A protein has these predicted regions:
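Basic/aromatic DNA-contact patch characteristic of tyrosine site-specific recombinases
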Residues: 1-41, 45-56
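N-terminal core-binding DNA-recognition domain of tyrosine recombinases/integrases
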Residues: 27-42, 52-145
Length: 148
């Protein structure tokens, strides 16, 4: 899984390639959509890397991105906090990766926006975006399920 920078006369964009060096078509279309709504180069790059991390997680779990569940999103957050729990090989030289809650929230925002794009473009029947951003009935203040 890797990110490829693509330059054209219209500017720079990014592609996410799977393990077979094939583009993940819906992710590429989403990144192109970000270009059409005039997102900055740094924003597009940040979104590309966040989506890549999500696709790495899905690949490690052998889950198709169109078949995710709420539990997969929760597990993805756990995976971002402790990615080495999912490896079968231990290393003495490994450094634990420290990801801040802010980075986790940014990544989940990118992922939820990607799923909103898929829903609005009729590639998914389930609206994960609304589900992930539902207001709690116990609080007047908004807190998403990603709140930590």
């Amino acid at each position: 899984m890797k990110i490829v920078e693509v330059k054209s006369k219209n500017g720079t964009n990014f592609m996410i390639l799977d393990g077979n060096n094939e583009p993940i078509v819906d992710a590429v279309r989403y990144l192109k959509y970000l270009d059409s709504v005039k997102k900055s180069l740094n924003t597009k790059k940040t979104y590309a890397y966040a989506l890549k991390n999500f696709f790495v997680y899905l690949e490690s779990k052998k889950i198709c991105y169109k078949e995710v569940s709420f539990d997969n999103f929760v597990d993805f957050i756990r995976w971002m906090k402790t990615p080495f729990e999912y490896e079968n090989v231990l290393s003495y030289h490994r450094k634990e990766k420290s990801i801040s809650p802010k980075t986790i929230n940014l990544t989940m925002t990118v992922v939820s926006n990607f799923y909103d794009y898929l829903y609005r473009s009729k590639k998914l029947d389930v609206n994960f975006y609304d589900f992930m951003h539902m207001e709690s009935k116990y609080s007047k203040k908004y807190k998403s399920f990603m709140h930590h």
